[in-house]
């Protein structure tokens, strides 16, 4: 038998309910999943806020500690930067001085070099003078001679030691035929002068012991260049109002007036004398 329409409706309703029931758990599952996601998001948000607050507090504490440490580190960094800058400036100055010296230093260096160059020839001259041996003497001084000894006697005695170039025997002013007691003998070779010194120093001439000594030749004197002084400038005459007239003119123009000498009058004495004479005559 064919089912009735009412049964058909019931069956269709049941099927729809079953389908709805089947769909409901899927929806519930999706709703549950959505709720879980929302709860997770809320938890994550709450945990994020708490962590942010914690991080803020920690960041504030760390910032305070960081500021203190930053100040100390800043001071140390500033000190280090200063030291670094000073060291860098020193290194730069040293490098600049080693690389390219300043113009003032160049001038000082040039002056020192010029001074050292100018001093070198003087040193060379001194060293040459020290190194160069002194010339050997050829002149002999003979002292403590008696007045009886003449040039001929000295020539006869000292010619035995070599060729004599010159004999200088000063004479006394007041007694021209007598010597002053000493003489100079100049030989041609220094060896001859040394031989005469060896034999005649402490020897005897005319019964008296004499002395013989070498005369050192002086160094040739260099003629110093004369420095001509500039001519003196004549001072201009003083102005008229400053000129004072000479004293002679003053005296001639205004001679001194001598006050007349006061003389005592002799008239009262005469009167007295007359009065006395008259009194005597009356008596």
Curated annotation (Swiss-Prot):
CDD domains: RRM_RNPS1. Transmembrane segments: none annotated. The keyword Transmembrane helix does not apply. It is found in: Nucleus; Nucleus speckle; Cytoplasm. Component of the active spliceosome. Residues 1-140, 223-283 are annotated as: Disordered. Gene3D superfamilies: 3.30.70.330. Keywords: Cytoplasm, mRNA processing, mRNA splicing, Nucleus, RNA-binding. Residues 161-240 form the RRM domain. InterPro entries: Nucleotide-bd_a/b_plait_sf, RBD_domain_sf, RNPS1_RRM, RRM_dom. Residues 104-120, 128-140, 244-276 have a biased composition (Basic residues). It comes from the Eukaryota. Pfam families: RRM_1. Belongs to the splicing factor SR family. PROSITE patterns: RRM. This is RNA-binding protein with serine-rich domain 1-B. One of its GO terms (cellular component) is cytoplasm. One of its GO terms (molecular function) is RNA binding. The keyword Nucleus applies. Residues 45-103 have a biased composition (Low complexity). GO terms for biological process: mRNA splicing, via spliceosome. Residues 10-36 have a biased composition (Basic and acidic residues). Component of a splicing-dependent multiprotein exon junction complex (EJC) deposited at splice junction on mRNAs. The EJC is a dynamic structure consisting of a few core proteins and several more peripheral nuclear and cytoplasmic associated factors that join the complex only transiently either during EJC assembly or during subsequent mRNA metabolism. Putative component of the spliceosome which enhances the formation of the ATP-dependent A complex of the spliceosome. May participate in mRNA 3'-end cleavage. Also mediates increase of mRNA abundance and translational efficiency.
């Amino acid at each position: 038998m064919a089912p009735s329409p009412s049964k058909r409706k019931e069956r269709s309703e049941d099927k729809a309910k079953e389908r709805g029931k089947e769909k409901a758990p899927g929806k519930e599952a999706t709703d549950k999943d959505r709720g879980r996601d929302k709860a997770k998001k809320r938890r994550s948000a709450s945990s994020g806020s708490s962590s942010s607050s914690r991080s803020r507090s920690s960041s504030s504490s760390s910032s305070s500690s960081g500021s203190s440490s930053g100040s100390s580190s800043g001071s140390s960094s500033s000190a280090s930067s200063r030291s670094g800058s000073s060291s860098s400036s020193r290194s730069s100055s040293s490098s600049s001085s080693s690389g390219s010296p300043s113009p003032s230093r160049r001038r000082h260096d040039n002056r020192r070099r010029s001074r050292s160059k100018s001093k070198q020839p003087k040193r060379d001259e001194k060293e040459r003078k020290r190194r160069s041996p002194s010339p050997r003497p050829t002149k002999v001084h003979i002292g403590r001679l008696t007045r009886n000894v003449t040039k001929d006697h000295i020539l006869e005695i000292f010619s035995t030691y070599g060729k004599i170039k010159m004999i200088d025997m000063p004479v006394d002013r007041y007694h021209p035929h007598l010597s002053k007691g000493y003489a100079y003998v100049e030989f041609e070779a220094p060896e001859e002068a040394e031989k005469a010194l060896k034999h005649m120093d402490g020897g005897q001439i005319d019964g008296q012991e004499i002395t013989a000594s070498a005369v050192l030749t002086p160094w040739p004197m260099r003629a110093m260049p004369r420095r001509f002084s500039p001519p003196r400038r004549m001072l201009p005459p003083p102005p008229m109002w400053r000129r004072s007239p000479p004293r002679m003119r003053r005296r001639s123009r205004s001679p001194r007036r001598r006050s007349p000498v006061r003389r005592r009058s002799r008239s009262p004495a005469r009167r007295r004398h007359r009065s006395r004479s008259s009194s005597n005559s009356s008596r």
